[in-house]
């Protein structure tokens, strides 16, 4: 299994505000779709509820401690240990609590860095480049629908870190 994080955060590591993305960036949504289609997404219940439905053409797995949680098209797990039992390419999709729990266990991270500062109430955990090697860094294209400067980073964990 390959275990990755996929996330977008601003310069202050904001990832959300009131259970929504604080920005609208279609390029990032397209990037996420390209990377995750055909693979597995693991997300917390609050993240799933903010999306409202399973993302198509992916296995959607929701981690929750609520025994009553059920949703068509979603597999439910109740512990972090169950993530290790998944196969294929598994993307940790959020939110904050799941990122905090998994950042030290993932092989790599796909991060869209939003070049701005947004109001937020959820954050991506701190990370340093001494633990991560930049595999790629691509500036996002700006146009009438994508007006916020952004960079797509792929970071790979350094050996022994």
From Swiss-Prot:
Residues 2-157 form the DHFR domain. It catalyses: (6S)-5,6,7,8-tetrahydrofolate + NADP(+) = 7,8-dihydrofolate + NADPH + H(+). Key enzyme in folate metabolism. Catalyzes an essential reaction for de novo glycine and purine synthesis, and for DNA precursor synthesis. One of its GO terms (biological process) is tetrahydrofolate biosynthetic process. GO terms for cellular component: cytosol. This is Dihydrofolate reductase. Substrate binds at residues 6-8, 28, 58, 112. It is an enzyme of class 1 (oxidoreductase). Changing residue 99 to Y: Trimethoprim resistance. The lineage of its organism: Bacteria, Bacillati, Bacillota, Bacilli, Bacillales. SUPFAM superfamilies: Dihydrofolate reductase-like (SSF53597). Trimethoprim sensitive. Keywords: NADP, One-carbon metabolism, Oxidoreductase. Belongs to the dihydrofolate reductase family. GO terms for molecular function: dihydrofolate reductase activity; NADP binding. Its EC number is 1.5.1.3. Pathway: Cofactor biosynthesis; tetrahydrofolate biosynthesis; 5,6,7,8-tetrahydrofolate from 7,8-dihydrofolate: step 1/1. Changing residue 32 to I: 3-fold increase of KM for dihydrofolate.
